[in-house]
Amino acid sequence: MAADLCWLSLLLASLALSGAVYEDQVGKFDWRQEYVGRIKFASLESGLGAKKLIAVTDKNIIAALNSRTGDLLWRHVDKDTSEGTVDALMMIGQDAITVSGGRLLRSWETNIGALNWEAALEPGSFQAVSFAGSQDTARYVAVLKNSALSLYFLSNGHLKWSESLPESDTVQYQLLYSPYKGSVHVVGLVPHSHLTILTFSLEDGSISHQVRVLTPWLRTLHGTCGVIGEGVLVCGDVPMASVHIVSLLSGEETTRYSVQSLDIELAEDPTQLDVITAPQNGIGGSLSQFFLQIAPRRFLLMHYHDGVLTPLRDFSQVSLVNFATTGEKTVVAVMQCKTEGNPKSGAESEYLTGQNCAQEPWYCPGHTYSINLYMADSGRRLLETTMSFTLDQICVRPDSFYLQTFLRKDDSVGYRALVQTEDNQLLFLQQPGKLIWLREESLADVVTMETVDLPLTGAQAELEGEFGKKADGLIGMVLKRLSSQLILLQSWSAHLWKMFCDARKPRSQIRNEINVDTLARDDFNLQKMMVMVTASGKLFGIESSSGSILWKFYLHGVHPGSSFKLLVQRTTAHFPHPPQCTLLVKDKVTEKSAMYVFNPIFGKLSQLAPPPLQRPILQSLLLPIMDNDYAKVLLLLDDQHKVIAFPATKYVLQQLQELHSTIFFYLVDVEKGKLSGLRLNKDLSTEEIWEVLLPADQQRITVVKGKRSNEHVHSQGRVMGDRSVLYKYLNPNLLVLVTESTDTHPERCFIGIYLIDGVTGRIIHSSVQRRARGPVQIIHSENWVVYQYWNSKARRNELTVLELYEGTEQYNSTNFSSLDRPLLPHVLQQSYIFPSAIRAMQATITERGITSRHILIGLPSGAILSLPKALLDPRRPEIPNEYTREENLIPYTPDIQIHAERFINYNQTISRMRGIYTAPSGLESTCLVVAYGLDLYQTRVYPSKQFDVLKDDYDYILISSVLIGLVFATMITKRLAQVKLLNRAWR
């Protein structure tokens, strides 16, 4: 009995110590979307009941997706460097074999994503990997490096043998083939000279056969050559317009087949001769058929057997081709542009502005494609296998596709298709073209974002229209008020009726679909439109409360690595003028700039044409002045230091001429280590007025950061313990310049922090952190700067905070001018030890700036830590006194601890977090937070708790019951008191 009581007490104690998020709070005002990135390799389970899809992406991820729903089953994220790059994927049964960074060979159990085994590879550049075995059974994994061939056991990953390759300094070994007959073949190439074919024995790794074949016409094996049949190497030769075939088993001289001799109609000589072969299957056999690509959109299905090369079928207007096997049947899939019908018009015509892809050779009018299956051995088309689908974006083409084939009961071939488009969209289709699910994988690489308030409803707009129009007169305003109230009453009645109807339905049947037509601002402005720009050049409009994608738009021709800048020129506050956003794109390859103006609510290009940008843009500046349509003026500075204004109306140009002396730019030249300031002239030219030069051979500029334009400062000073006021140095023109040393040695590296006035070029403050290195994460807000760096001496991460004050007397309380500041501010500085690396940092922001500030820190683990700014206060005393206690200053301790209860995303971690975006809401207590990386996460934070709204668990029934009870008690007590007074009077 005593033992039972002891166990019960321990159980109760453990329950008391456990903590979690309440069940009704999970997903109530937050959501997370997980992505994997652009697919490099994919394998779909075959069979009618297959449910799994294995994918390897460019984000160094191996993942499994549910082929029925598109949901993520499991995901493994490797290093975000070249060491984590997945070079190859092979499937055998329920196991996946991958090569990572050319260093690690791994085996995965695909049902649960568990790691079966891992083996370290021999040094050298990775070339190829293949299964190997004997008697048509795979038992080993062969890995080819540029100078060695290694063989590993498939069951446990142990090394069986590793052999060096002869003449590896001159021969480029690139191809690996195993016939599953106790040997493995390695093919090396000396460009424009000869092929070297080596045959290794699987038992001891000895070279059983070596032959050299002259190939003076061959430059590379990749894309040009492939293995078919029983060890037959097929290569294309463009200059000679022929196909060369050599046997890897016998090593005989090449046999040349001219394309002209294959009875193929050619208008001109082929522009390319690429060989596309089917992947080697799990029992060692290879198909005798292959595709020969003779033009960008023309493919030939070829068959080779017993020295005879035969064309089976000629395909034109082809986008993509692929092979698939189910049972004993092997088919080829051909994707072609479906030319029937007219190109799309209507709503899509609004997107055509700035899109010039109609002249591209791959352009498909109507954006409709069809997939057809053909028997690989004969080229015969299979009936009832056509699948048609239409892409929702113009100037987008399919990039790759994979098949999931199965045999029906009547022994016919059925299939589903996974299509990946140029804009990183995944579509999973089934016959005859039904879309099962869709994933937008470009959201795994968000580079910038902004939020826009949702528009008012018709009733709200009608109510807003009452104010500011006195010309209607008293009677007119009263009638307008009555009509607007009737509209509100009508909408309220419709809302009550919908609630009544939904209450009678099961919860599964209640639909709260969100689309652009039903979007409306909520009472507290918590629901916003998130405009996201991805690295692939695709824009998204996402509703913040649910994460639903309402619109998307792809910018064709944007090269990887291009820079983007998103600006909100007009919000929804200026009804009936629509909101307006401007996206600036600077191409990394051509260095040309482009500008797109669009409506962020509907995702349509604006009717206002942006100015043509003939020169590269160096800097942009969004001014607070507006044109007649309430759009903020955007100034663009090109490489000739000329300024372009948008919109360039007469009213705007007049304002610029009046205010030109108060408009300044700054430019950063990283190569020269130069920060310069320019002033605008009346003729929209600029002149340089100051510059700061840093020794570029010793340090390089890494970050230049100003303050957020939408930031509000509620208090201009801090009340100290002696009741005096310490006034903040609130310079809106202040820039923070961060430099890192070019010397990376731990004893000599350093980082520099410079606070520079962007108008005068005056250095307000500078400091150097010795034995420190980046990357530096920084926040610049109000009168303080917080930055993080790595201390090489102490080998730890540190946070440093700077706060700037004018002193106990304010120089000018009504207007700040950088030209009239004779005294430098007082700078307070303090450093802290932080126990983790930091991937992203941002400060909370609210509508009026009254709420306490918190620092949101993204950790490598994917958690987001909400750290009160009070902990990063340089005035924290080491020894508290009565004045510091009066100010509630926390005593100084050098380390900042990470408490799990400060994580705002509990278990909803964000992989590879790149940025945190914060936006104010209509409630002063609430800040909206969006974290992006591989995943997207949106939530709300309350730095000072919810002081301006009732909590969700507020007990309305209890309070109402108490109030009603008090009212009745008051009435009864009053009646009893009257009776008592009457009885007393009669006495």
UniProtKB/Swiss-Prot annotation:
Q: Which UniProt keywords apply?
A: Disulfide bond, Endoplasmic reticulum, Glycoprotein, Membrane, Signal, Transmembrane, Transmembrane helix
Q: Which cellular component terms (GO) are annotated to the entry?
A: EMC complex; endoplasmic reticulum membrane; membrane
The yes or no answer to whether the keyword Glycoprotein is present is yes
Principal localization reads endoplasmic reticulum
In the bilayer, the protein is annotated as: Single-pass type I membrane protein
Family note: Belongs to the EMC1 family.
Q: What is this protein called?
A: ER membrane protein complex subunit 1
Q: Which organism is it from?
A: Xenopus laevis
